[in-house]
Amino acid sequence: MQRTPRMENLQARFDAVQDQLIDIYEKDTRSLEVQVTYWNLIRREQALFYYARQQGITRLGLYQVPLTSVSERKAKEAIKMSMYLTSLQKSPFAQLSWSLSETSPEMFFAPPESTFKKKGSHVTVVYDKDSNNAMEYAVWGEVFYVDETDTWHKAQSKVDYDGVYYTDAEGKKVYYVHFADDAAHYSVLGQWEVHFENNVLSPPVTSSFPGGPGRRQRPQTGSYSPGHKAPVTSRRRHSSSSDSHSSRRGSRPQSLSRSRSRSRSRSRSPSGSHARQRAPQDSGTNKSPGRQGGRRGDGGGGRGGGGGGVRVREDTFGGQPTQIAGRLGDRPAKAPEQTSRRLAQLIESANDPPVLLLQGCANTLKCFRRRTSHAHPHKFLCMSTSWTWSCKTTTHKSCHRMLVAFSDYEQRRCFLAGVKLPKGVTCVKGSLEAL
């Protein structure tokens, strides 16, 4: 396609937006004002993509122009984030540190939705008392939400047996995680335990999740309804209140899951009694003379036992081959005495982190770094900023450079095989003692 003045003008405006975005990425400023500027630039970028697609342009520089529906959705998302951040900028929380990840749409629309979040931790819920059947849920230490009057508030998340919630300015609990919802999918018995900050929260009676729209309400217990329940803090409190709850559930029919659990416990009791009957026979065999001699040998203090212990130690630890560490930056202390000096140097240099030195134009390298960081973040360890040699003794060193580091040589091989370098960018291989 022949380039027209209109296309060149569009390309120039797009490059200007990309330069400003790259500057924000490199500076990593945690100011709310910078975050607002960032989302305004994203909106402009998507608007240029939208216009270019309407004009039949499929590429702008190194970037593939997306469909108009994709550009429209991302532009609306950027407008929404810009409006929320502008409102937050007028609140007392504007002076806090805000990073790009904390103001991203993925974080903003995660539960609790339409809130900014900080200081995340996890709560573990074990279903059916099976440690392999457990789920982790996010608990945010700081939740920033806006009310109907465009006023921002900060709340702290809390955990009880029903789920994770925060208390709003009116004193109402706002749940954003309900454990009963996942219990309907992951639990067979309808039971779960909540492990949070070295505390275990469990119900005073065996709980099963009922069906229907009102499955979170348990009026028979009187302690776990979202409206008026008191948070449970330890097992000791459950045991002290079990008498009062047992009278309330007397008229309630027994659930199928509880009857199955009792049948399993009764079926295990015969095997347990059989094991107790066999115990005297086993203890009698321990008193035989041959067994007593073996026990003295195991202790290491008798005449027949000391040598056996030494032989086991020699077989276990003796003659192990020398292993060369394969982790990043690790080196063997010294090469074996049988190897030559050149071979020892090769062994030492084999563990140095491999790198690639890219050469090309500054803007091309910056765009390549941004594109690769989004599309192939797992294929390299880290990338440097673009730089040049300060003492230019020859004109051949005038191009910009950028280093790409890898954890091992296999990762570098996969990078060269799966990532295409831009036109005009060359690379050379190398390694460093450390990063």
Curated annotation (Swiss-Prot):
UniProt GO MF annotations: DNA binding; DNA-binding transcription factor activity; nucleotide binding
Biased amino acid composition, Gly residues: 299-310
A family per Pfam: PPV_E2_C
Keyword Transcription regulation: yes
Location of region: DNA-binding domain: 352-435
Compartments, record wording: Host nucleus
Keywords: Activator, DNA replication, DNA-binding, Early protein, Host nucleus, Phosphoprotein, Repressor, Transcription, Transcription regulation
Listed Polar residues bias regions: 280-289
Transmembrane segments: none
Span list, region Transactivation domain: 1-208
InterPro entries: E2/EBNA1_C_sf, Nucleotide-bd_a/b_plait_sf, Papillomavirus_E2_C, PPV_E2_N, Reg_prot_E2, Regulatory_protein_E2_N, Regulatory_protein_E2_N_1, Regulatory_protein_E2_N_2
Claim: Cell membrane is one of the keywords in the record: no
Region (Disordered): 203-339
Subunit structure, interactors included: Binds DNA as homodimer. Interacts with protein E1; this interaction greatly increases E1 DNA-binding activity. Interacts with protein L1; this interaction enhances E2-dependent replication and transcription activation. Interacts with protein L2; this interaction inhibits E2 transcriptional activity but not DNA replication function E2. Interacts with protein E7; this interaction inhibits E7 oncogenic activity. Interacts with host TAF1; this interaction modulates E2-dependent transcriptional regulation. Interacts with host BRD4; this interaction mediates E2 transcriptional activation function.
Main function: Plays a role in the initiation of viral DNA replication. A dimer of E2 interacts with a dimer of E1 in order to improve specificity of E1 DNA binding activity. Once the complex recognizes and binds DNA at specific sites, the E2 dimer is removed from DNA. E2 also regulates viral transcription through binding to the E2RE response element (5'-ACCNNNNNNGGT-3') present in multiple copies in the regulatory regions of the viral genome. Activates or represses transcription depending on E2RE's position with regards to proximal promoter elements including the TATA-box.
Family affiliation: Belongs to the papillomaviridae E2 protein family.
Protein name: Regulatory protein E2
Source organism of this protein record: Bos taurus papillomavirus 6 (Bovine papillomavirus 6)
GN (gene name): E2
